[in-house]
Structures are given as structure tokens and as C-alpha cells.
């Protein structure tokens, strides 16, 4: 066997280098599929779901972030830490 004297570290480093070069070549190839389209919600919607048919629904109800927060009735003035 001719490869008996070649160390495994050298072979693994060559394999890693080859994978890196293949990754760079694939990344440089232009692709028309850019993945799913991400739409930003309109300002003030607080992350409410948006679709073509939800605009009328969103206009009729307030966004979820405008709900009043529940009051904490528990007394939290004391602490258990020393």
C-alpha cells in the first residue's frame, strides 16, 4: 500500500479543504430560488398575521399587543434573597 505512510491528519485536512472549495463554488452559482418571501407587517400591527384577506379583519379589531396587562395582586415587595 502506497498510502501507508500518509497520515490521517493530512488526508482529513485535504478532505476538509476540498469540501470548503466545493462549498464556495456552489455558493457562487446564481440561483433563482431565493427561498420563501418574508413580508414585514405594517407598523403598529404588533406581529399580527397578514395575508391578502386579513386586512379587513385587522382593521376591525385591535392588534394583540394593545390588550391591557393583568395586574399582579401578589405582594412582591419582600425578597427571599439575603
Curated annotation (Swiss-Prot):
Physiological role: Brassicaceae-specific phytocytokine (plant endogenous peptide released into the apoplast) perceived by MIK2 in a BAK1/SERK3 and SERK4 coreceptors-dependent manner, that modulates various physiological and antimicrobial processes including growth prevention and reactive oxygen species (ROS) response regulation. Inhibits the fungal growth of Alternaria brassicicola, Sclerotinia sclerotiorum, Fusarium graminearum, yeast (Saccharomyces) and Botrytis cinerea, thus being an antimicrobial peptide (AMP). Prevents global growth and development.
Record note on quaternary structure: Interacts with MIK2 (via extracellular leucine-rich repeat domain); this interaction triggers the formation of complex between MIK2 and the BAK1/SERK3 and SERK4 coreceptors, and subsequent BAK1 activation by phosphorylation.
Biased composition (Basic and acidic residues): 68-82
Molecular functions per Gene Ontology: LRR domain binding; receptor serine/threonine kinase binding
Family to which this protein belongs: Belongs to the serine rich endogenous peptide (SCOOP) phytocytokine family.
Organism, scientific name: Arabidopsis thaliana (Mouse-ear cress)
Signal peptide residues on this chain, from the entry's feature table: 1-27
Principal location class: membrane
High-level lineage: Eukaryota, Viridiplantae, Streptophyta, Embryophyta, Tracheophyta
GO cellular component assignments: apoplast; endoplasmic reticulum; Golgi apparatus; plasma membrane
Residues spanned by motif SCOOP motif: 43-55
Keyword hit for Ion transport: no
Prodomain positions: 28-42
Compartments where found: Cell membrane; Secreted, Extracellular space, Apoplast; Endoplasmic reticulum; Golgi apparatus
Keyword list, A-Z: Apoplast, Cell membrane, Cleavage on pair of basic residues, Endoplasmic reticulum, Golgi apparatus, Membrane, Plant defense, Secreted, Signal
Gene name linked to the record: STMP9
Expression induction: Induced by pathogenic bacteria Pseudomonas syringae pv. tomato (Pst) DC3000, jasmonate (MeJA), ethylene (ET) and salicylic acid (SA), mainly in shoots. Induced by increased levels of photorespiratory hydrogen peroxide H(2)O(2). Up-regulated by heat stress. Strongly induced by the necrotrophic fungus Botrytis cinerea, both in locally and systemically infected leaves.
The organism's place on the tree of life at top rank: Eukaryota
Protein name listed in UniProt: Secreted transmembrane peptide 9
Keyword Flavoprotein assigned: no
Residues covered by region (Disordered): 61-82
Motif placement: SxS motif essential for MIK2 binding: 43-45
GO biological process, alphabetically ordered: defense response to fungus; defense response to other organism; response to bacterium; response to ethylene; response to external biotic stimulus; response to fungus; response to heat; response to hydrogen peroxide
Tissue expression as described in the entry: Mostly expressed in stems and siliques, and, to a lower extent, in roots, leaves, seeds and flowers. Mainly observed in young and mature trichomes, hydathodes, the shoot apical meristem (SAM), leaf primordia, hypocotyls, stomatal guard cells and emerging lateral roots.
Amino acid at each position: 500500500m502506497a498510502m501507508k505512510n500518509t497520515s490521517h491528519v493530512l488526508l482529513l485536512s485535504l478532505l476538509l479543504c476540498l469540501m470548503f472549495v466545493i462549498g464556495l463554488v456552489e455558493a457562487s452559482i446564481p440561483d433563482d430560488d431565493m427561498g420563501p418571501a418574508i413580508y414585514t407587517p405594517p407598523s403598529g400591527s404588533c406581529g399580527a398575521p397578514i395575508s391578502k384577506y386579513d386586512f379587513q379583519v385587522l382593521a376591525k379589531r385591535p392588534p394583540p399587543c394593545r390588550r391591557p396587562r393583568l395586574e399582579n395582586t401578589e405582594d412582591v415587595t419582600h425578597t427571599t434573597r439575603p
